[in-house]
Amino acid sequence: VASIHSGFGRFLILNWPHTDSEHLMVSSEQMQNIEKEMFSMGMPVEALMEKVGIGISSWILDRHGLIENGAIVLVGPGHNGGDGLVVARELYMAGVDISIWCPFPLKKQLTQKHFDYAMQIGIENLERKPDSNSDLLWIEALFGLGQSRIISDEILRLLNSKKTFSPDKLISID
């Protein structure tokens, strides 16, 4: 891993052209290495979570057709779920009809804090799994880079059903 400096700060570079970072694609292993390097330099998890969530919500808001009928964030137990909760908060604050669904107990304190705040500001927490036949945008924040557990058949069926019904209304974040 190498780094460069610019007027906007220090950037980590692996083996890609930094001149086209908007279209950058990295593997899970590369992203884990980037995050590891960032954290070793002192980047707080909280700051990265905010940066990621705000960036994703901005991307979604720029594509209004995705959210014209509203959105649901599927929240996982770890920091990926926290990223999703930041996205939910930002979309809610922008006036999007948003709800969340948490099929697993939350395991990370930071994710729990974002969940608690989402509840305080009035974001709806669905008690039951969402309808995969709806025209709502699904933002999947269930599984992160460190995913090691087997994904349940129920979750797989639900995501596959949404993908089949409206593939343009399902995005995964991490």
Predicted regions and their residues:
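Extreme N-terminal basic, low-complexity initiation segments
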Residues: 2-7
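Glycine-rich phosphate/dinucleotide-binding loop and adjoining beta-alpha-beta core of small-molecule
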Residues: 9-14, 22-25, 65-74, 79-173
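Positively charged, low-complexity intrinsically disordered leader regions
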Residues: 11-66
